[in-house]
Amino acid sequence: MDSSTLITRLETAKTSFQSLERQLADPDVAADPKLLESIARERARLEPLVLDFEALQHVEQEWQETKQLLRESRGDDAMESLAQEELQQLEARKTVLVRRLTLALLPSDPRDQRSVMLEIRAGAGGNEACLWAGDLARMYERYGQRIGWSVQPLSATEADLGGFRELILSIKGDAVFSQLKFEAGVHRVQRVPATESQGRVHTSTATVAVMPEADAVEVQIDPSELEISTARSGGAGGQNVNKVETAVDLLHKPTGIRVFCTQQRSQLQNRERAMEILRAKLLERQIAEANARESSTRRAQVGTGDRSEKIRTYNYKDNRTTDHRLGRNFSLEPVLTGQLEELIGACIAEEQRHQLEELSHQEED
């Protein structure tokens, strides 16, 4: 991004920030909690950008003043040396600020701030794949706890020998999708199963899909396109089990997407959850179709959300996690206990690098 474009966009952001501050002082806005929350959230998003822009302007002013001092100090070796040293420090600070501001202005996914539904499906590997799906679920639950997110099961199909054939987690919090979107794809594990008597390493897989939450306005569903049936649930226990039909089986006929929800205590709650899951799945389908229409350059980026892409291998014998998109290894144990900050941070940095490259090519054209 050239300097003139950067400054223009920063000036626009600063003007927007000042407008939002004026709106927050408006009594009419204060009387509307929903509007107030929306404006406050947008102001909070812009504030770090505006503060960095003001810091850059201050550095620019100091640089000009120091440059003038250098011109006036010709012949005074000590003063010239001090001025040169100050200029180097200011240029280093300017470089850091410009890069940070450029990254902050890169195009962002409008869905980044949303909560998500995270679906884990056992893949190749039979019972071991189901156990692996359960291990992945615990990994994401622990990461959510570390971050301060709310993690709740929405739908689960348990396997006979432990683990899950399929599990959907609701993960709510700030900017959940911006981080977890990098987890979509095939996760492969290489380890000796507990049931393996010969000590042989087995390879199993599980597929993760990360679906940003969708509201009823964004994804509209025609009730006539739904086929809904109920069943007895083995859910909460007590007299409810096998006596009341609380489970909901929902089929979206145009797409063939099926959602079976049993986690809630009432049929109404399970139906609401099933509709939430269906909307998220339909939105994910729309996103996948949009990604398929984009250029190969865009698809080569890290956060494409393609659930068929093999993204990571977890090797127990070597205590190693390999992210194939990054070409990097990470220690296995911290990752499995939910310490995903370094790994996800590396994915974000790689995506930003791709975006900067693409921006550079566009400017050259």
UniProtKB/Swiss-Prot annotation:
Keywords: Cytoplasm, Methylation, Protein biosynthesis. Its main location: cytoplasm. InterPro entries: PCRF (IPR005139), Pep_chain_release_fac_I (IPR000352), Pep_chain_release_fac_I_sf (IPR045853), Prokaryotic/Mito_RF (IPR050057), RF-1 (IPR004373). It is found in: Cytoplasm. It holds the Pfam family PCRF. Signal peptide: none annotated. GO terms for cellular component: cytoplasm. The modification N5-methylglutamine is found at Q239. One of its GO terms (molecular function) is translation release factor activity, codon specific. Peptide chain release factor 1 directs the termination of translation in response to the peptide chain termination codons UAG and UAA. Belongs to the prokaryotic/mitochondrial release factor family. This is Peptide chain release factor 1. The gene is prfA.
